Amino acid sequence: NELEQKVINVGADVGFATDPDGDRLSIVSNKGNAIGEEYTLVLAVKNYLNYQKSIVATNLSTSMMLESIANETIRTKIGEAHVVQKMNELNIPIGGEGNGGVILKEVHLGRDSLVAISMILSLLSSSGKSISDEISNIPQYLRIKDKILIDDKIDFDSLETIFDCNEINKIDGIKFIWPNKWIHIRKSNTEPIIRIFAEAKNQDEVNELINTLKNYLK
């Protein structure tokens, strides 16, 4: 797109794009590639942890890349308000969501793209590395978002036997967790659908998670 091309044309170290209300940030690398909103929080947290040890608060569907950076991650229901509530409850200084939202408590308790930009620029300045180099040192995962029509009466407790996993989290729908993959299933608040989020090391693993769930719900 236009920003990707502009980064290449001017030889920029990084490109930033915010949403209209300035609470979410996307990044374009020095190679002119949009790297995905999931990296915004991960890179901001990496910078913060260079200076101060901290727990990090985020929602259930944020990438497990965060666990590779942070010593401890607290997961919440999806939604900025739930992340902020947990930050207040446990006095956690930094948090956010995988949609490009970074929350730094010392500034204010809300997602802020300018905070994210400043933290990522600080990371690049202190490390002397490019954005491309920084993300190459972070474990890579493939993510898929999907949805399926459902019966409103579906019982989430009945879904627990679909997968043989290491951990199940039921604070917001149901999430099945393994060391290097997960699938999160939750009802939409506005539509008769289940929203599905899945992440794994490769396409085959992600597809297997999604297909297993869909076949069970047929």
Tell me the role of every PLM-derived stretch.
Residues L3-V7, V45, V83:
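Generic hydrophobic alpha-helical segments
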Residues D19-P20, A34-L41, H108-D112:
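Short glycine/threonine-rich catalytic loop with a Thr-x-Gly-x-Asp
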Residues N50-K218:
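Phosphate-binding and adjacent anionic-ligand microenvironments
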Residues N1-V28:
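N-terminal small/polar loop signature for handling phosphorylated ligands or for N-terminal nucleophile
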Residues R24-V42, L66-E67:
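Short Gly/Thr/Asp-enriched flexible loops that form oxyanion-binding sites at enzyme active sites
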Residues A34-Y51, K77:
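Short, acidic/small-residue loops that bind anionic groups at enzyme active sites
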Residues D19-P20, S29-K31, W178-N180, N189:
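Short acidic-glycine loop/turn motifs at beta-strand connectors
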Residues P20, K31-G32, T40, S61, ...:
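Short, ordered loop/turn segments at secondary-structure junctions
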